[in-house]
């Protein structure tokens, strides 16, 4: 079982993936190959993410201990079976709720699929990125980490959609990732 910090250490390195996208509405399937390069980020980079993030009334207090908030830089290159290529790089920071104050106005309930059993050990917090996947600019989401399942789940509310991204480490060299993206419900505040 990996603790919160060890999970992120295990994520570092070069990952090659074969992805399959299922577009339910029109019944299409698309395949692609992606190489991810993941490296840990330094305290200065973590501070930079905090400074550009839209935190509203929330206050993050790491008390100079940036180790409690793991973060990494991700760069990837994807080539689809149609020959289309996409490259992107971003930095992400994971701040546990214990280090965030005045968060009631930013607490968005997770979608039903993302809800977890509260009786087990769970770390919840805010997921900050310097760049969104489907929308440009810094983005703020929520995460949960379940050590017993070695599973990180990130929920991001974009303007028009919601993405629920789940990453599970099965073994040191194998991870499973599922991303479900759907239209954002109109009753969720921005």
Predicted feature descriptions by range:
Residues 4-190:
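Soluble ligand-binding/transfer domains with enclosed cavities or grooves
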